[in-house]
Amino acid sequence: MYYSNGNYEAFARPKKPEGVDNKSAYLVGSGLASLAAASFLIRDGQMKGENIHILEELDLPGGSLDGILNPERGYIMRGGREMENHFECLWDLFRSVPSLEVEDASVLDEFYWLNKEDPNYSKCRVIENRGQRLESDGKMTLTKKANKEIIQLCLMKEEQLNDVKISDVFSKDFLDSNFWIYWKTMFAFEPWHSAMEMRRYLMRFIHHIGGLADFSALKFTKFNQFESLVMPLIEHLKAKNVTFEYGVTVKNIQVECSKESKVAKAIDIVRRGNEESIPLTENDLVFVTNGSITESTTYGDNDTPAPPTSKPGGAWQLWENLSTQCEEFGNPAKFYKDLPEKSWFVSATATTNNKEVIDYIQKICKRDPLSGRTVTGGIVTVDDSNWQLSFTLNRQQQFKNQPDDQVSVWIYALYSDERGERTNKTIVECSGKEICEEWLYHMGVPEEKISALAAECNTIPSYMPYITAYFMPRKEGDRPLVVPHGSKNIAFIGNFAETERDTVFTTEYSVRTAMEAVYKLLEVDRGVPEVFASVYDVRILLHALSVLNDGKKLDEIDMPFYERLVEKRLLKKASGTFIEELLEEANLI
């Protein structure tokens, strides 16, 4: 397996790998990583679909990519997916998956046309004082010290950041900036999270720094992620005769492990209550999605909080069982045990057709929520909320069969141990109606109307004990390599597998690890697209410098006297050169 860039490799079709007709594949879980791996096995590995088996513990595919109408509760979205144009592996996948919405088009075609016709951006990113837009919204408000800390972090080597927290590398200057408000609420970073992952994010998305404040960097699907991404993949794979088995819990994979070789010999499962073992040969490839951020989710309703839990589910127990067999299979406890009580645990879906509530939403987002087009353009964050509450409405309706007069709002609180201004409770203690009341309060609904309007919404809370597990501080070796050294037939896929440079909590990471696993185990002779190399582009770096300093010119940026002298001399030498052109393009001179 090797990395590539450019369209020479992107448009090429690899030859059929030797011996693939004699191979089969077992994929543990039916999340995006597994569905992507199955697709790459068929398209690029040219494996027969009937030789591919997807084993899913639940009765529904999709993993964390959800969006359902629960008959007892109502519409539920545990989260959303922010995408961008340089998710190279994701788009490589979906260019080959037929759209369920547009005839003779791929999912990529559909997505591309949609976001061309209705580009995403926010008209109000942060509010305070019960519905008032933050006066400095749109500015980064980074001090000289904070900017220096960002640069220092990016210049460090990854191995210098083993088990280092964000709070270890950033001071109060940075944590008090608008940049941090945008960053932490958009990505769900918190000060106790991994500085290593923070660095990856900064370097991975530096080309989108200019779109951080207004979300113009982002792209979204038409409907919820289950209907827009998962269902087309499922239908595509079913048409290729891939086998889906639900109600199957994989308890363990027996692996013969040495430093030189790892061979999966059997899969121990419980199928509808019966224990079984699936024997394996080296021709039987196993793809494991280790760990899960939505495992063990509990649900409440309008009148009941979602019950807190810390019980690990099958994906964590499987990873624990694998890690005891081989130290190269990672350290799951690092991610799912002892998450701080302040962490994000709860999100909620509020569904309503109440015109007064919809009007309050429109007052903040400056768009008609029922237009079928972009609404908030990403999350709106309440800066003075103790919960650090945020909410968003993507294009409505979010569900294909949803009534035309209805909207579904996604709400989450970054801090789970703080009491709300309206409810005087933590979000964990709140029923759906109480979460809705807190949201309506911060939107500026008069207090005497809040309770009645909250009753006009059906709000379903979800408690996810491991939702921020990706971000916990880690060191090299805590996550297994996608294909461990010497592995003959076992690979790890998803956001708890280790690959270079890319960032977790993204659809791209799931698809990238799947692609790498398939290409390596089958020896597919085609390059995996490298992570977009924006951090190596001097134009992008100069533009980022301008944005991080809120558009100031070089001669306006606060510098020590000596640095100012050096800057003036360098600018004089750059006059009339290509360097001057670059600085002008970046709005620095």
Swiss-Prot record:
Binding-site positions, FAD: 33, 56, 64, 82, 250, 292, 506, 510
Substitution effect: residue 34 to A: 1.7-fold decrease in catalytic efficiency
Pfam families (UniProt xref): MCRA
pH dependence: Optimum pH is 6.5 with oleate as substrate.
Pathway: Lipid metabolism; fatty acid metabolism
GO process annotations (BP): fatty acid metabolic process; response to toxic substance
UniProt catalytic activity: (R)-10-hydroxyoctadecanoate = (9Z)-octadecenoate + H2O; (9Z)-octadecenoate + H2O = 10-hydroxyoctadecanoate; (9Z)-hexadecenoate + H2O = 10-hydroxyhexadecanoate; (6Z,9Z,12Z)-octadecatrienoate + H2O = (10S)-hydroxy-(6Z,12Z)-octadecadienoate
Thermal characteristics: Optimum temperature is 25 degrees Celsius with oleate as substrate. After 120 minutes, the enzyme activity is nearly unchanged at 25 degrees Celsius, but is reduced to only 25% at 35 degrees Celsius.
UniProt keyword terms in alphabetical order: Detoxification, FAD, Fatty acid metabolism, Flavoprotein, Lipid metabolism, Lyase
Origin: domain of life: Bacteria
Cofactor(s) for this UniProt protein: FAD
EC number(s) from the headed UniProt entry: 4.2.1.53
Broad EC category: lyase
An MF annotation (GO) of this entry: FAD binding
Function per UniProt: Catalyzes the hydration of oleate at its cis-9-double bond to yield 10-hydroxyoctadecanoate, probably in the (R) configuration. Cannot catalyze the reverse reaction. Is not active with saturated fatty acids and trans-, cis-5-, cis-6-, cis-8-, cis-11-, cis-13-, cis-14-, and cis-15-double bond unsaturated fatty acids as substrate; is only active on cis-9- and/or cis-12-double bond of unsaturated fatty acids without any trans-configurations, producing 10-hydroxy and, to a lesser extent, 10,13-dihydroxy fatty acids.
Quaternary structure, from the entry: Homodimer.
Family: Belongs to the oleate hydratase family.
Protein name, entry field: Oleate hydratase
Biological source species: Macrococcus caseolyticus (strain JCSC5402) (Macrococcoides caseolyticum)
